């Protein structure tokens, strides 16, 4: 089960700006996303064109910083969601295609944390839940094929942005292996390079490039 928590994906200034835009616009019942959703979800969705345009522009700029790690082809538009008291999202699996892209990664970005309940959860193959309560500005990214949901909000209001990404790597196993390798690779320091030595570092880089040439296929 692949889950990555990115602490502080938004800094304090970005959080203020996003929340200011979030407050604007028109909120509608979240079931607008699909006719079958009424049975499983109970939330609100911001459908204001200008709000969606501004937030999408900002998110797509920020997401470019992750391209070295995740080999992303493209990202979907952002869903601007609100969960008020007692609102929730029952067990579900996201559609394999969303907004014209194949959904390989689901991304959930929290704009606040001053609420009770409302934990995002993911179920394993045994049906066991793992709960995630993100801090404001944190983002979680996980394999879209996993069963997940949102527990009822007990007090306050949960503000989130949700979007999906298409990987340039088709094979799920290779996708996760490359992410793990890339995260490790980009954390190497000058001391690590010195310890490896130039020749071994070149060999390591050659192996990485060959794997990417064979498995990473970016769209034009």
Where does each model-flagged region fall?
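Non-heme Fe(II)/2-oxoglutarate
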Residues: 1-72, 177-220
């Amino acid at each position: 089960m692949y889950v990555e928590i990115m602490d502080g994906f938004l800094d304090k200034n970005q959080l203020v700006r996003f929340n200011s835009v979030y407050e604007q616009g028109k909120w509608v019942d979240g079931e607008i996303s699909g006719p079958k959703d009424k049975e499983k979800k109970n939330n609100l969705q911001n459908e204001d064109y200008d709000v969606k345009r501004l937030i999408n522009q900002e998110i797509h700029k920020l997401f470019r910083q992750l391209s070295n790690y995740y080999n992303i082809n493209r990202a979907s538009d952002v869903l601007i969601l609100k969960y008020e008291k007692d609102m929730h999202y029952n067990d579900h699996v996201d559609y394999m295609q969303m907004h014209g892209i194949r959904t390989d990664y689901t991304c959930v970005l929290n704009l606040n944390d001053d609420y009770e309940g409302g934990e995002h959860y993911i179920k394993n193959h045994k049906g066991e839940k793992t709960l995630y309560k993100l801090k404001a500005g944190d983002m979680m990214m996980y394999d879209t094929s996993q069963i997940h949901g949102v527990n009822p909000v007990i007090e306050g209001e949960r503000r989130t942005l949700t979007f999906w990404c298409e990987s340039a790597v088709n094979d799920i196993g290779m996708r996760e292996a490359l992410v793990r390798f890339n995260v490790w690779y980009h954390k190497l320091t000058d001391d690590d390079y010195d310890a490896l030595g130039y020749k071994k570092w070149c060999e390591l880089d050659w192996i990485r490039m060959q794997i990417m040439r064979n498995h990473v296929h970016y769209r034009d």
